[in-house]
Amino acid sequence: MSTSTQNIPWYRHLNRAQWRAFSAAWLGYLLDGFDFVLIALVLTEVQSEFGLTTVQAASLISAAFISRWFGGLLLGAMGDRYGRRLAMVSSIILFSVGTLACGFAPGYTTMFIARLVIGMGMAGEYGSSATYVIESWPKHLRNKASGFLISGFSVGAVVAAQVYSQVVPVWGWRALFFIGILPIIFALWLRKNIPEAEDWKEKHAGKAPVRTMVDILYRGEHRIINILMTFAAAAALWFCFAGNLQNAAIVAGLGLLCAVIFISFMVQSSGKRWPTGVMLMLVVLFAFLYSWPIQALLPTYLKTELAYDPHTVANVLFFSGFGAAVGCCVGGFLGDWLGTRKAYVCSLLASQILIIPVFAIGGTNVWVLGLLLFFQQMLGQGIAGILPKLIGGYFDTDQRAAGLGFTYNVGALGGALAPILGALIAQRLDLGTALASLSFSLTFVVILLIGLDMPSRVQRWLRPEALRTHDAIDDKPFSGAVPLGSGKGAFVKTKS
């Protein structure tokens, strides 16, 4: 940017079309957040009506994560081939239909399947919306684009909590899911009223269709074995998270099978850059493991251990969700100022100071608890708003939606494991101690993975000839692309 351009307020760098694109995607992501968290709010009511164990009830949260990897792959490939807009609209329709089905579910199995559908739609919405907005905004504002967009999910969670307190005590838990059908109307409006992402249009103008991840995996020479592996992964995840399999050794074996399948898919689709993709999946896995025990089981903790009524639960969840939403926006500013990775590490380190007090204070002072949760979620959860920007920077435009969608949503299986892990630990400890311990310890793993830029570093160790030295979204250098101790002069930009 020139000096004169730097003196202009950041929001003046955006034209009306870019703001409209952002607003539409943000509302879509708000509705995604609204639909997705409904099950966490009514988990105790559903558990009571269906007669479920704690682990079975937690598996209803996990179910949406089981299908996310395939939704991210399929809808991401749609975004790479046909445009980000169509993928975003299709995703909204998919998770809305799943939410409506939850309201009609007669029992555990039906609701579990409906949650699988929600997971696919949610995965597609994440990848398509994030790439859509990031590719529509100027390069120097793309951390803000990412952070502002992801704040919509937290706002949706806040809205859902407030609606829960008004609807469920009067009409019951099923009525909450019937409201979730409204996003379909919004999706139909989106299809006609928003432009396509600029980066995608420029990349595809006058060119033949790209070879997407779906083409590589399911239309290539290994398509039969890949289809079989897809069914094997789906079956393995079902047995792991449906709540019926109690043998830890079998669960571990099935988990290892899934890991091998996902790594195989990454190697086939990414070629020589597979180490980067595998490490990104690991980053996201631990990001979910540290954050989702709190996200998923906080309502249960408030209702059971602190004995809060629905109105008080809604108020506390407002502080939590609003803090995460504010944190996404703050993270966007920090990312554009400090750089994506440095902002991420600094925010997580600050959040560690607050995680123990949140669960040590008890339920005697609701307002102090709410304030602590606000700042802890602002720093610990909100910074994940720039995670799409961080991941997307490792992929070229013509593979970004599927690359981001698949990588993120395979790692998001940590979100499926997290509430079950929290519930299992809570059988030996109280739930608050279990949640605090998981979050505090696993956050440090994420700090190391991102702070040391392990995706670039492992790529340099294993396949240096395919190393990307600069971020594909904002052109900033990757710190892990050069050995520790090397100066800035060691960076030589590689061709995509």
From Swiss-Prot:
GO terms for cellular component: plasma membrane. Pfam families: MFS_1. Its main location: membrane. It is a multi-pass membrane protein. Catalyzes the proton-dependent transport of sialic acid. Belongs to the major facilitator superfamily. Sialate:H(+) symporter (SHS) (TC 2.A.1.12) family. This is Sialic acid transporter NanT. It comes from Salmonella agona (strain SL483). The lineage of its organism: Bacteria, Pseudomonadati, Pseudomonadota, Gammaproteobacteria, Enterobacterales. The gene is nanT.
